């Protein structure tokens, strides 16, 4: 390749990335996921689009997509809090294993019938599209305000279910190549090997990488690069010795993100950019790889297969997988059933049969791509609507304008949070000494206009003041309440109810105040303990219980315990003024 061709390649690549970024603003206007925009740019630049670029290198696409997926999972793992495992780990694992198997099997049976294929080839299509996609789920759920049980379950499931789909895909390809028609014990052993090696190597490699980052003294900009390089080494090593590289790098990210690590914010900041670049690059390449005209002949059976998977296979898999977990309400199960988002992973897996030279491999690829398009357009674009209908949304916690890590020592967890005070903030007009700051936090600076003030305890806050507060991540909820808008009936109260009660209020006192009947309920029990008992011991903000004809909603959690409960009366039956216990 001469210099001129290299320059053309660089220019076209940069142009496609820039076009994807510029067109991403259309996502909100059109009501479609931003990843669909990236995919559309690739398709427009491809062989059937205005660009006319002919790209048929499946191996290169496979390499690029795997690299991008690894980076996305490493970033997603670092941002997943292990505290959510309290309510989400077991159900997510059930969905990632049993759920994928059921979805793949039912989808495969339908594929064999719709496309008149041998059973094993139909099951191969089911395996290819059997898992949800981490890149899509992390992207679409970010900032949507889902309750912890639902949001964390979907995120952990998407980060851990790819090994099952990949294992089923590879196993079925090997069976088709060998002419086998039955599963043996080695099938189960191989599955255990994939999960076992991936998990162990992710934990061990993540721990070693953490120690290296915390002990090594280099330029700040090199720590994120070291984290990425280490994660990719773990990803590659796990795959080379028979484990799941996808699971290994996700577990590695989990460990790095939940332990004190040097230059945490620098790493996360760079990871954010790398994850976006990976998503753009991956969906651009997959868009270039697709020939839209080849989808038309299979459109009707592929659409029927998509609807079968979305409306029957996925819901049945979810309901069966979540049977042991009583804490999931029906509406939460229905929402999880609907948000079975497919993305790049099915397309990556669909490249396997092409590289293996299987019969009907191009059909498998086109069907997988069609299902991904339907999933992104149908499920992705209706996520917010479905969350509202299923009542799994909770009011988002107020967040600072910006936050920056303070590298006080090697594994410092100190941060600086910046808040701008608008007229609706209830702390406006208060003196600094009157603010009930969380223990261990300090106001480091106060800006008024362009001036840095030297405040005292008597300094009163004004509209448009900018406060710089030093604290820890766990202080954000309290700081958010302190520097947030004053609560109104149109905001938190509309969701949580008419009154907000303290979690340690006794049921007997509440019953006496509101004229409720305790029945067989222990009056000495606190309302917080009562709520936890009613939702099978793992409550999350947004959980609702009907008792005495009233709606009780978990309004705040702390260290796994219910701290505040919202009480909502039926319309037209609200006694007295609002009370705060």
Swiss-Prot record:
One of its GO terms (biological process) is cell volume homeostasis. Residues 403-485 form the RCK C-terminal domain. Keywords: Antiport, Cell inner membrane, Cell membrane, Ion transport, Membrane, Potassium, Potassium transport, Transmembrane, Transmembrane helix, Transport. The chain crosses the membrane at residues 3-23, 34-54, 58-78, 87-107, 109-129, 165-185, 187-207, 231-251, 280-300, 303-323, 334-354, 367-387. It is found in: Cell inner membrane. GO terms for cellular component: plasma membrane. It is a multi-pass membrane protein. It catalyses: K(+)(in) + H(+)(out) = K(+)(out) + H(+)(in). InterPro entries: Cation/H_exchanger_TM (IPR006153), FAD-bd_PCMH-like_sf (IPR036318), FAD-bd_PCMH_sub2 (IPR016169), Na+/solute_symporter_sf (IPR038770), NhaP2 (IPR023729), RCK_C (IPR006037), RCK_C_sf (IPR036721), Transptr-assoc_dom (IPR005170). Pfam families: CorC_HlyC, Na_H_Exchanger, TrkA_C. Belongs to the monovalent cation:proton antiporter 1 (CPA1) transporter (TC 2.A.36) family. NhaP2 subfamily. PANTHER family: K(+)_H(+) ANTIPORTER NHAP2 (PTHR32507:SF7), NA(+)/H(+) ANTIPORTER 1 (PTHR32507). This is K(+)/H(+) antiporter NhaP2. It comes from Stutzerimonas stutzeri (strain A1501) (Pseudomonas stutzeri). The gene is nhaP2.
């Amino acid at each position: 390749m001469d210099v001129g061709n290299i320059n053309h390649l660089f220019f076209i690549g940069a142009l496609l990335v820039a076009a994807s970024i510029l067109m991403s603003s259309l996502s909100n206007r059109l009501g479609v996921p931003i990843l669909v925009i990236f995919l559309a740019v690739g398709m427009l630049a491809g062989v059937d689009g205005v660009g006319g670029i002919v790209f048929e290198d499946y191996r290169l696409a496979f390499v690029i997509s795997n690299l991008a997926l690894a980076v996305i999972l490493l970033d997603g793992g670092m941002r997943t809090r292990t505290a959510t495992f309290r309510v989400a780990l077991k159900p997510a694992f059930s969905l990632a294993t049993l759920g994928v198997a059921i979805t793949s099997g039912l989808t495969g049976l339908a594929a064999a019938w719709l496309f008149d294929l041998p059973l094993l080839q139909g099951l191969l299509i089911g395996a290819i599209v059997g898992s949800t996609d981490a890149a899509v789920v992390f992207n679409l759920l970010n900032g949507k305000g889902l309750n912890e049980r639902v949001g964390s379950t979907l995120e952990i499931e998407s980060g851990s279910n790819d090994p099952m789909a990949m294992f089923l895909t590879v196993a079925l390809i090997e069976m088709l190549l060998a002419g086998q028609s039955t599963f043996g014990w080695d099938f189960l052993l191989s599955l255990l090997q994939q999960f076992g090696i991936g998990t162990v190597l992710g934990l061990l490699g993540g721990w070693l990488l953490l120690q290296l980052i915390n002990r090594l003294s280099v330029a700040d900009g090199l720590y994120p690069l070291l984290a990425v390089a280490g994660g990719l080494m773990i990803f590659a090593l796990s795959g080379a010795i028979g484990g799941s590289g996808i699971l290994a790098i996700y577990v590695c990210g989990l460990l790095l993100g939940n332990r004190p690590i040097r230059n945490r914010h620098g790493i996360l900041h760079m990871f954010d950019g790398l994850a976006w670049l990976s998503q753009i690059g991956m969906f651009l390449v997959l868009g270039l790889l697709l020939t839209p005209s080849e989808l038309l002949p299979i459109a009707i059976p592929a659409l029927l297969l998509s609807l079968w998977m979305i409306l029957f296979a996925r819901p049945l898999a979810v309901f069966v997988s979540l049977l042991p977990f009583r804490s999931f309400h029906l509406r939460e199960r229905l929402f999880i059933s609907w948000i079975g988002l497919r993305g790049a992973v099915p397309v990556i897996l669909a490249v396997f049969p092409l590289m293996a030279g299987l019969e009907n491999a191009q059909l498998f690829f086109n069907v997988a791509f069609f299902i991904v398009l339907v999933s992104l357009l149908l499920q992705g674009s209706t996520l917010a609507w479905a969350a509202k209908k299923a009542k799994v949304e909770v009011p988002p916690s107020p967040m600072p304008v910006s936050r920056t890590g303070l590298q006080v020592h090697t594994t410092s967890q100190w941060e600086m949070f910046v808040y701008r005070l608008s007229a609706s903030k209830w702390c406006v007009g208060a003196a600094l000494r009157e603010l009930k700051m969380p223990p261990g936090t300090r106001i480091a600076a106060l800006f008024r206009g362009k001036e840095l003030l030297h405040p005292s305890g008597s300094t009163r806050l004004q509209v448009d003041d900018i406060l710089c507060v030093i604290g820890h991540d766990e202080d954000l909820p309290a700081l958010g309440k302190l520097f947030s808008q004053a609560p109104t009936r149109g905001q938190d109260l509309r969701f949580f109810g008419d009154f907000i009660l303290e979690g340690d209020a006794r049921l007997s006192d509440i019953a006496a105040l509101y004229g409720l009947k305790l029945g067989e309920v222990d009056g000495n029990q606190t309302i917080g303990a009562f709520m936890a008992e009613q939702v099978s011991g793992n409550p999350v903000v947004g959980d609702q219980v009907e008792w005495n004809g009233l709606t009780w909603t978990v309004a705040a959690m702390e260290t796994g315990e219910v701290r505040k409960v919202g009480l909502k009366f039926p319309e037209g039956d609200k006694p007295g003024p609002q009370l705060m216990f």
